[in-house]
Amino acid sequence: SNLLNEEELAVIDKQKRTFTEPQLFTIGYEGRSLEKYINILLINDVHILCDVRKNAYSQKYGFSKGQLEKACTGVGIKYIHIPQLGIESEQRQDLKSQKDYEILFESYEKSTLKENWDYLLYVRELIDTEKRVALTCFEESRKQCHRGRVAKYLMQLPDITYTLKHL
C-alpha cells in the first residue's frame, strides 16, 4: 500500500542524511512524479510538508490533498495544509508574463500575507520545533509561485536560525 517498496526505501535510506540544522525548503511538483517528489523530500530529511495551495486539489496523480497526505505519512513526513496562505484560483487566470506574476504576488503580499500573518508565524513555529519544513505548491519555478514570497517573508523574521533552500 506504500508508494515505495522495501527495496526503494532502502536505496533512499542510503542517500538520506539526517540533518540537525533547521532549514526551510520550497518545492513545486510541476513536472515531477509523486515518487520523485517524495524522494527529494526524504533525501533532504524534510519532517513537515506545508501545502500552501488554496485548494489542495490536483489533476496530477498523487497531488490532491488526501493522496499527498497518505504518501507523506507512509514515509514518516507530516503533511499540513495551510489554505490561508494560498491564492484564489480566479486570481491566477490570465498570467501570461513574468510581469503578470509580479503584479499578482505584490498584491498577495499586501493583502493575503498581511491578513494571515498568524499563519506565517505558525510556519515559523513549525521550523523552530520540527527543524526541517518544506513549503509546497504546484509551479516548478518559485518565481511563478507564491511559495517564494512566503519563504521571503519567513526569511525576514527576526532572530531566525534557519536557512532557505529551493528544491
Predicted regions located by residue number:
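Residues lining hydrophobic/aromatic ligand-binding pockets adjacent to catalytic sites
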Residues: 1-167
